[in-house]
Amino acid sequence: FLMDLATEIGRLKRRAAAKGLKAAVRLNGTSDLPYERYKVPGTDKNIMELFPDVQFYDYTKLDNRFINKKLPANYHLTFSRAEDNDHKLKKVLKHTSAAVVFAGKLPKTWRGYPVINGDEHDARFTDAGPGVIIGLIAKGKARHDKSGFVINQKEA
């Protein structure tokens, strides 16, 4: 898989360069795999190290990927706050930004941290941070969430 991924990223990089752009890749669409740990077969490098001029980014619920870990310079991780990892948020915000889902309108600040509109784009590596809340408006089934995943305005 990693060899195929490297081939595809190489193609993307060439297409982006032909248009005068820098390639950006989000590795985890629905998973939370620590790609920084996986070496591409036949190399001693992970995928980010193999493509130092490509920007990689992901969301993760795993706080241990930030704390005392050295991530590749071209890999930006945004913490995904949920009801079961909320207690880790303050510590994580010292290292990165955090995505938080809100019911209704986004607040200007939350728990003393500035909130920016994360629904405008997904290029989290362009955000100011650490210590910034990436506010997302609850959509679909999340609008009816009662688990604590979605922050209600009374809590904001």
Annotate each language-model stretch with its function.
Residues 1-156:
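Class I S-adenosyl-L-methionine
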